[in-house]
């Protein structure tokens, strides 16, 4: 049951639609390298499409009815878009869910130090990373510094053409014999992933008893104060600054068929999900798109999928729509259908031994469906019902969407998980779906434009027809 390459069927008009979609996606990916920025961009997209903040609806005491469109944000890191359908909410929702946190390095709370006449920022990695990926590459600092007076300073240094960039040094090959003999996981110690941010000291009188003990670090702090209004080093205690690859997403391949960028996992699913949501109108079953944080570290915390944000927001909406009983809420959740959208491992001929080709995701063959994920005996996975898989197949076929079914590599080769099992706890039908990528969790991942286009088409069809 080999699936065909999606590119072979496209008309000139479809190629134009594909390129337009991917231009928007490249811009989104390049400009929004943190979960906060993704949510902010998602809110802008929603408001331009006529969505209203749920908090405004609640404050004004308005009722909700079919055709109303609302959004809710959670700590600036989660976003839920809701388009109310004509059917009673108790009959359930059609839900898309993706995450917008990506593997990265986070600054520690007390990060700044000086060594060897250079200023550094100490980091702690976030998510599943290979430490050796992060050395000798241009890096950017993106995030927020929250000050005690209640103001927030936005930090975004390294992505503009005239910005300085940062890096983590690597050991020169001439002195690397011991390093090169280590397993890859030990070649670069995660504790030494320290970002070089300066190499010039402030000027001072050597005899001045108040002269800074770390003059290069002081120069870095002085520039932060002058250019960003960060008054004191202690403001790092209440900061969330992420170290991410510097530079934009770009077309890849001489035929421009792919996109190389940071954060395809999982913004390559989040962006087409949001776009499908705002482009679907006059639905029967209420459509919901959920964009969440913390998936890469287990979906924990107030902004992870295990929080009550989704359930609480649904309860608010059902109450405003006149269906506010606890039983109606439980029925609505259990009767819902969901595509849990996350990336899949694209077949890589260079590492073919890690894949079983009958059930592998191939680049350019369309939207991926993973009936189950997990590892070593499907541990920790959601396993979609056969009846639900049949329903999803029917929706995709009737909409002419190219799709493929796949697993995350050979049996016992490894594995992974998504938010699917968390949503399935409500009793709803959930299946994992998404886009195949190469070099998953590396600084620069690869996605095929045809797969992004088919993902958008598939998500839109699901919201309209499920």
Give, region by region, the residue ranges found by the protein language model:
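N-terminal hydrophobic/helix-forming segments and targeting peptides
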Residues: 1-466
């Amino acid at each position: 049951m080999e699936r065909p390459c999606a590119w072979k069927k496209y008309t000139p008009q479809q190629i134009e639609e594909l390129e337009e979609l991917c231009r928007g996606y490249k811009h989104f990916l390049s400009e929004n390298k943190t979960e906060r920025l993704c949510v902010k961009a998602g809110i802008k997209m929603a408001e331009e499409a006529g969505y209203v903040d749920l908090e405004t609806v609640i404050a004004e005491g308005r009722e909700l009815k079919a055709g109303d469109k609302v959004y809710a944000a959670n700590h600036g890191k989660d976003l839920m878009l809701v388009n109310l359908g004509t059917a009673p909410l108790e009959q359930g929702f059609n839900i898309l869910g993706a995450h917008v946190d990506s593997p990265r390095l986070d600054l520690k709370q007390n990060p700044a130090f000086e060594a060897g006449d250079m200023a550094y920022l100490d980091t702690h990695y976030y998510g599943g990373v290979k430490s050796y990926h992060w050395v000798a590459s241009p890096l950017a600092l993106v995030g927020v510094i929250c000050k005690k007076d209640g103001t927030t300073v936005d930090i975004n240094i390294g992505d503009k053409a005239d910005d300085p960039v940062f890096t983590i040094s690597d050991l020169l090959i001439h002195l690397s014999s011991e390093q090169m003999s280590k397993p890859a996981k030990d070649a670069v110690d995660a504790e030494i992933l320290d970002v070089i941010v300066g190499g010039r000291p402030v000027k001072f009188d050597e005899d001045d008893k108040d002269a800074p003990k770390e003059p290069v670090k002081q120069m870095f702090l002085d520039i932060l104060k002058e250019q960003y209004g960060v008054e004191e080093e202690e403001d790092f205690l209440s900061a969330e600054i992420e170290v991410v690859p510097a530079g934009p997403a770009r077309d890849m391949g001489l035929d421009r068929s792919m996109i190389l960028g940071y954060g395809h996992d999982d913004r390559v699913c989040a962006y087409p999900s949001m776009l499908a949501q705002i482009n679907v109108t006059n639905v029967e079953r209420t459509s919901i798109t959920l964009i969440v944080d913390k998936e890469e570290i287990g979906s924990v915390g107030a902004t992870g999928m295990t929080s009550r944000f989704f359930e609480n927001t649904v309860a608010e909406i059902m109450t405003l729509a006149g269906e506010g009983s606890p039983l109606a809420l439980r029925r609505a959740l259990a009767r819902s259908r969901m595509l849990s959208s996350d990336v899949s491992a694209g077949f890589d001929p260079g590492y073919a031994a890690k894949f079983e080709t009958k059930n592998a995701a191939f680049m350019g063959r369309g939207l991926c469906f993973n009936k189950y994920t997990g590892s070593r005996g499907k541990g920790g996975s959601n396993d979609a019902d056969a009846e639900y898989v049949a329903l999803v197949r029917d929706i995709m076929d009737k909409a002419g969407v190219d799709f493929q079914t796949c697993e995350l590599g050979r049996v016992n080769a490894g594995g992974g998980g998504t938010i699917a099992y968390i949503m399935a706890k409500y009793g709803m039908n959930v299946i994992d779906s998404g886009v195949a990528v190469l070099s998953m969790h590396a600084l620069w991942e690869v996605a095929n434009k045809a797969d992004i286009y088919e993902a958008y088409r598939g998500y839109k069809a699901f919201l309209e027809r499920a």
